[in-house]
Regions:
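Glycine-rich phosphate/pyrophosphate-binding loop and the adjoining helix
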Residues: 85-141
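Helix-loop-strand module that forms the ligand-binding subsite of alpha/beta enzymes
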Residues: 1-92
């Protein structure tokens, strides 16, 4: 695997992303998260900041439900979820993705739609927010 459960324990913050699969996170990510019972029991992720992002092949392909499906286990772990506030101007103008729940991208069925400037701005804002929040939390334990 590209990441191991121990990496979650050692991270200062988590950006969790998945393509949408019928309104849910992809099965391999779900399988990975389902294996994190030891971290849940120990509280290893409690208090760490996290955000979620996704992409879909169709405009109404389940972006928000996918983001929510990734948020639920993070909440069970006691992580601090960061959304995208409406103070981000691009959230009001984007036509290709983005939600208060997290950054999204509508890639098109063939994956041929480029990331718009609004989508890029929202992703950068989310990354900046995670970085700024992770730094003060880094020494929490």
């Amino acid at each position: 695997p590209y990441v191991e459960l121990a990496d979650l324990e050692n991270c200062a913050g988590l950006a969790l992303g998945s393509p949408t699969r019928f309104g849910n996170m992809a099965a391999p990510l779900k399988y990975f998260i389902d294996g994190s019972s030891a971290q849940w029991l120990s509280g290893a992720l409690a208090g760490k900041p996290a955000c979620v992002f996704t992409s879909t092949g169709s405009l109404h392909g389940g972006q928000e439900s996918t983001l929510l499906s990734m948020m639920l286990p993070l909440l069970h772990h006691g992580m601090l979820l960061l959304g995208l506030p409406y103070s981000e101007p691009a959230l009001m103008t984007t036509g290709s993705g983005g939600s208060p729940y997290g950054a999204t991208h509508w890639s098109g069925i063939a994956g041929d739609k480029n990331i718009s400037e609004d989508t890029r701005a929202l992703a950068i804002a989310k990354g900046n927010s995670l970085a700024a929040t992770s730094t003060p939390c880094n020494g929490r334990r």
